[in-house]
């Protein structure tokens, strides 16, 4: 085999493998995000109706919930919230899309009866 051909073939193979590696690293670079919602329960009966609806909507949108309902919270600085909900998302964009979705908006009447949002925000992890 011609040495120039071997070098050219090796360069093409190297470039292809390098491009594949860069693509793989880029795919892994997507950072997870978490929404944190501090709430005050207004009506426990309404909350028992709302909870399965919002959990189904979150799951349908690809979110993963942590069972923090009724768990203890302690404050290291400032006041501890009364109740906190935490949801894991594949990306900050996915979290934002859910909060802006019809599935979330359509539950507002039930949510407003069940609980009051004190604060809701999303945070992106810096590594997976």
Where are these predicted regions, by residue range?
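A short, polar/proline- and glycine-enriched secondary-structure boundary/capping micro-motif
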Residues: 78, 108-109
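C-terminal end-helix/capping segment
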Residues: 112-128
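Basic side chains
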Residues: 4-6, 68, 83, 111, ...
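Bacterial N-terminal signal peptides that target proteins for export
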Residues: 1-11
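Short, exposed beta-strand-loop hairpins at the edges of beta-sheets
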Residues: 96-99, 109-115
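Short S/T/G/P-rich N-terminal loop/turn motif that feeds into the first structured element of a domain
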Residues: 14-100, 123-128
């Amino acid at each position: 085999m011609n040495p120039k051909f071997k070098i050219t073939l090796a360069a093409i193979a190297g470039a292809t493998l390098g491009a594949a590696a860069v693509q793989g690293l880029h795919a892994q670079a997507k950072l997870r995000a978490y929404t944190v919602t501090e709430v005050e329960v207004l009506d426990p009966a309404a909350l028992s109706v709302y909870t399965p609806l919002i959990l189904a909507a979150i799951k349908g949108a690809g979110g993963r919930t942590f069972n923090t309902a009724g768990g203890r919270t302690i404050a290291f600085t400032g006041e501890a919230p009364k109740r906190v909900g935490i949801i894991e998302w594949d990306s900050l964009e996915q979290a934002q899309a859910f909060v802006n979705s019809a599935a979330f908006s359509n539950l507002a009447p039930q949510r407003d009866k069940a609980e009051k949002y004190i604060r809701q925000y999303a945070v992106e992890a810096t590594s997976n």
